[in-house]
Amino acid sequence: MSGISAQLVKKLRDLTDAGMMDCKKALVEVAGDLQKAIDFLREKGLSKAAKKADRIAAEGVIALEVAPDFKSAMMVEINSETDFVAKNEGFKELVKKTLETIKAHNIHATEELLKSPLDNKPFEEYLHSQIAVIGENILVRKIAHLKAPSSHIINGYAHSNARVGVLIGIKYDNEKNAPKVVELARNIAMHAAAMKPQVLDCKDFSLDFVKKETLALIAEIEKDNEEAKRLGKPLKNIPTFGSRIELSDEVLAHQKKAFEDELKAQGKPEKIWDKIVPGKMERFIADNTLIDQRLTLLGQFYVMDDKKTIAQVVADCSKEWDDDLKITEYVRFELGEGIEKKAENFAEEVALQMK
């Protein structure tokens, strides 16, 4: 420690946020050269970060920022290993700088972010330095950066626990309706945060996915019906289809004729068929689009009015406001979705760190 002053140690600590003993060791290793000591600590920090990187980061935050004019919005998922660190002021500052960098460089993917400059160095280098200082693996996992063309707005909602965030984009024609469209987008975002639709529209499903889900759905309903029969309760209809994408014009025409043939066989006069068939068709479509009702935003029943789907709510607003509204963007992030946290014995984890 000869020749290493307390002032030099303090200066290095102020520059790097590293621990006092680490700063002393670094200065001794490089004979008091401040720049080399900074490099030494950076290398040491990166080394620690690399060891931490094989630990699962499944806590953290979902953070979003909507522009005041509702013409753009950003959302990011940043993972940490523990909820405690996610509440750390240093972690909050990292989240803030991440959003600032995304905005400044028009970033749309994590790969772009890591290469982008922040304070004259790559963001990736800044991230590694924060991993070393905070002491946990930190991962910028997802980024959404939406920009609205003319006659579109974007609004969003982040749950107060910072574990769920949603962005919604809506197209409209009448500018005087913009404030109401902004509010509608936020309400729909709140719905999506709670109800977890996987996609915006059934058109986003593959036919293979729908067929697989329909088989599982039928098995589920048959099981429910066994219990309902035992209890003497009404049975649910067994669907033939699961999604609107399967209900082609030919399928609907065939079903309509089947209903008409049924009414004819019952001796119902043809002049009243038009009053009966539409209701039967509506029920047929409802029974055969259960996957849409569960997994699509437009097909779900609105939490604020459970007699209408989101699609119907948007259509009703269009009519009421003399406009032509359409949801064009839907992005939902849920913290740690798809990640499984490692269940490790704490003593074993400490032992691994000591290696």
Swiss-Prot record:
Its main location: cytoplasm. It is found in: Cytoplasm. It comes from the Bacteria. GO terms for molecular function: translation elongation factor activity. One of its GO terms (cellular component) is cytoplasm. InterPro entries: EF-Ts_dimer_sf (IPR036402), Transl_elong_EFTs/EF1B (IPR001816), Transl_elong_EFTs/EF1B_dimer (IPR014039), Transl_elong_Ts_CS (IPR018101), UBA-like_sf (IPR009060). SUPFAM superfamilies: Elongation factor Ts (EF-Ts), dimerisation domain, UBA-like. The keyword ATP-binding does not apply. Residues 82-85 are annotated as: Involved in Mg(2+) ion dislocation from EF-Tu. Keywords: Cytoplasm, Elongation factor, Protein biosynthesis. The keyword Protein biosynthesis applies. Associates with the EF-Tu.GDP complex and induces the exchange of GDP to GTP. It remains bound to the aminoacyl-tRNA.EF-Tu.GTP complex up to the GTP hydrolysis stage on the ribosome. PANTHER family: ELONGATION FACTOR TS, ELONGATION FACTOR TS, MITOCHONDRIAL. HAMAP family: EF_Ts (MF_00050). Belongs to the EF-Ts family. This is Elongation factor Ts. It comes from Helicobacter pylori (strain HPAG1).
